[in-house]
């Protein structure tokens, strides 16, 4: 079975002669609007560029990027300066009274350079780098969810537009049928029961049309939430190309490349490095401290002094009240948790992959079945109408045949929608539902550019991407 279908949706009302003039006009306007309507790739591009959930996830990644320069800062010196000035009065009692007015002034600058921090700096840097990698995968997951929601919203609107047009057409057909039945009742060809049956079906059709209008309004609102604008009349979407050919291939790719799985892997690596970072607090710490100072004791007496020093400091932890040991144990438990979560995400990715694949296979089988059902229902309706003309069929038989055709057409539209959504679900399951793989006409967000701009930054308050 070839599942790499790229055929567009297609649904037609072959018996257009049965539609009212108003329905024909509505369908004509709908078809004309698709010439410049928003396509599915355009809608996905708009969501990629403007969706607030995705933009917030990018900002979150940029904030996590800052963990790396924060850890790298522990390789660098810290510099502090200080100054003081004041007033001091001294009185000395003796044979000769004397007083002195002193105005002390001091200034100093201190530089502290870490030499060894028990391996915490290296471990902390590696932890932060793995946290960045994990957050990038989380961003990929958010991007996939946003694009999948956008594709789903698009196809829901398309389906509901199509169903509404079918219901409008059916309402027009039943209105004509009721009018014809009343005319025949006037001349005694049919009974009052036939008229009542036609009236009942028309009332039901009106109710169905109103319900489909409500469904379309809800779908349009969901479209606006995800994509950022209300849709016009949407052209038929297509099943995405380049899908894996077999279910086993989908599962194999998903358990390796699904972003939720890869994010869990990097999170576990970060947790391992955190164990080493916390353990480093049990090791000695060595730093080099340099100091320059100037002191002026008095404005009356020349007592200026300058000093300079360079000191190596060693701090050896002996006992920290058990706090560090507890935090090491905590870090080990977190690492164990993250390792278990990798398996959890792999199982979840496999389940999602199988479900998406089965949904795709089912939708494609249903399309073939419903296409056959529509063709058969059209033939049956035409035959019932001809038989009614010679008295072999009743008005109820015609109404039933028309309803069967409508049901088949609505089911076909629903299956076509399900096929497209399932195709995008398969792409999402294998981690390929992104702007690059789907070829969206957008500037792809560069995660490396923001990271490089801050990784080795020693100072500066400007933040990339902030508004």
Where do the language-model regions lie?
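Metallo-beta-lactamase
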Residues: 212, 266, 415
């Amino acid at each position: 079975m070839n599942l790499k279908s790229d055929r567009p949706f297609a649904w037609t009302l072959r018996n257009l002669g049965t539609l009212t003039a108003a329905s024909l006009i509505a369908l004509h306007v709908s078809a004309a609007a698709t010439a410049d309507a928003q396509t599915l790739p355009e809608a996905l591009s708009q969501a990629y560029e403007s969706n607030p959930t995705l933009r917030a996830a990018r900002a979150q990644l940029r904030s996590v990027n800052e963990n790396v320069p924060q850890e790298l800062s522990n390789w660098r010196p810290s510099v502090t300066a200080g100054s003081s000035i004041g007033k001091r009065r001294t009185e000395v009692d003796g044979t000769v009274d004397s007083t002195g007015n002193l105005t002390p002034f001091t200034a100093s600058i201190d530089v502290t350079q870490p030499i060894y921090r028990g391996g915490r700096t290296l471990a902390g840097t590696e932890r932060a780098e793995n946290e960045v990698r994990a957050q990038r995968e989380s961003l990929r997951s958010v991007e996939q969810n946003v694009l999948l929601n956008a594709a789903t919203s698009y196809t829901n609107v398309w389906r509901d537009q199509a169903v509404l047009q079918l219901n409008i057409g059916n309402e027009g057909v039943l209105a004509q049928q009721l009018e014809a039945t009343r005319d025949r009742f006037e001349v005694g060809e049919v009974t009052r029961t036939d008229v009542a049956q036609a009236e009942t079906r028309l009332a039901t059709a009106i109710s169905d049309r109103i319900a489909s209008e409500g469904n379309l309004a809800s779908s349009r609102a969901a479209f606006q939430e995800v994509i950022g604008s209300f849709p016009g009349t949407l052209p038929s979407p297509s099943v995405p190309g380049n899908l894996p050919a077999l279910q086993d291939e989908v599962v194999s790719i998903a358990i390796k490349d699904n972003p939720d799985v890869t994010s869990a892997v990097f999170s576990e690596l970060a947790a391992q490095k955190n164990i080493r970072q916390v353990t480093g607090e049990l090791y000695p710490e060595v730093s080099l401290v340099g100091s320059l100072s100037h002191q002026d004791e008095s404005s009356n007496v020349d007592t200026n002094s300058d000093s300079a020093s360079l000191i190596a400091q060693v701090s050896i932890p002996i006992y920290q009240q058990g706090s560090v040991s507890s935090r090491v144990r905590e870090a080990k438990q977190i690492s164990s948790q993250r390792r278990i979560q990798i398996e959890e995400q792999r199982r979840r990715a496999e389940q999602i992959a199988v479900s998406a694949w089965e949904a795709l296979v089912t939708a494609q089988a249903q399309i073939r079945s419903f296409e056959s059902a529509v063709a058969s229902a059209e033939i049956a309706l035409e035959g019932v109408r001809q038989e009614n003309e010679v008295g072999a069929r009743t008005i109820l038989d015609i109404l039933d045949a028309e309803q069967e055709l409508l049901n088949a057409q609505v089911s076909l539209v629903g299956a076509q929608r399900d096929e497209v959504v399932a195709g995008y679900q398969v792409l999402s399951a294998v981690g390929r539902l992104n702007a690059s793989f789907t070829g969206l006409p957008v500037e792809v967000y560069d995660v490396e550019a923001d990271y490089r701009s801050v990784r080795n930054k020693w100072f500066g308050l400007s933040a990339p991407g902030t508004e």
